[in-house]
Regions:
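C-terminal charged capping/lid subdomain of soluble metabolic enzymes
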Residues: 119-192
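Active-site segments that bind and position negatively charged phosphate/pyrophosphate groups
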Residues: 6-133
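Conserved anion/nucleotide-ligand pocket segment
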Residues: 1
């Protein structure tokens, strides 16, 4: 999701930046299952690691809006439950996209078309299908996407994270800086 946080906002005319992100995502979709099947597959592993480098070296975020709210929520799940970073992002991201659907649907549909080859349906249909394809991909990799898959002690987690954000003064996350702690609470609850 490190790529998605620098991509999944709204269309802003940064064609090359979008294509960089989309190519990284397509490469990960192609090679991640191969790496899991055979970690000694040097070609797959090297392409996977190069994709990881591109996800975090700062290139794909240049000149585009970013949304690191999924990261902020995911880090809290790691702190509270010891769930590894990638898994917490897979827990939060689908709920984040569903909660913020109206502001993200254009980019979600673009992602669906360009990364997942979803060509049928309306913008809304493509956007919803893209979220579902992403969840299915996580599952194919053996990554669960609900907090309840990792712990039975999840009740109250959303409220605790919202309070932590309030205490830190994190009152407006996301690309529009409108994701308040009460909205974070709703997203985390959707992730149960």
């Amino acid at each position: 999701t490190h790529v998605l946080e620098q991509y999944m906002t709204y269309p802003n005319g940064a064609i090359l930046q979008d294509r960089f992100s989309e190519s990284v995502l397509q490469t990960i979709i192609d090679v991640a299952p191969k790496v899991l099947k055979d970690p000694t597959d040097y070609n797959a592993a090297s392409n996977f690691m190069w994709s990881c480098t591109m996800a975090l070296n700062g290139l794909i975020q240049k000149g585009v809006p970013t949304d690191w709210a999924v990261h902020a929520m995911g880090h809290e799940l790691t702190a509270l439950f010891g769930i590894d970073h990638a898994r917490t992002l897979a827990i939060v991201a689908p709920s984040h996209y569903k909660f913020n659907f109206e502001t993200k649907k254009e980019k979600l549909a673009q992602y669906g078309e360009r990364v997942w080859n979803i060509t049928e349906g309306s913008t809304d249909d493509k956007a919803h299908a893209a979220i579902e394809k992403t969840v299915a991909f996580f599952h194919d990799l053996g990554i669960d996407t609900k907090l309840s898959d990792y712990t039975q002690n999840y009740e109250g987690t959303a409220e605790e994270i919202a309070q932590r954000f309030t205490d830190r003064g994190w009152l407006g996350l996301g690309e529009h800086q409108t994701l308040s702690p009460d909205k974070v609470e709703k997203i985390v609850k959707m992730s149960y």
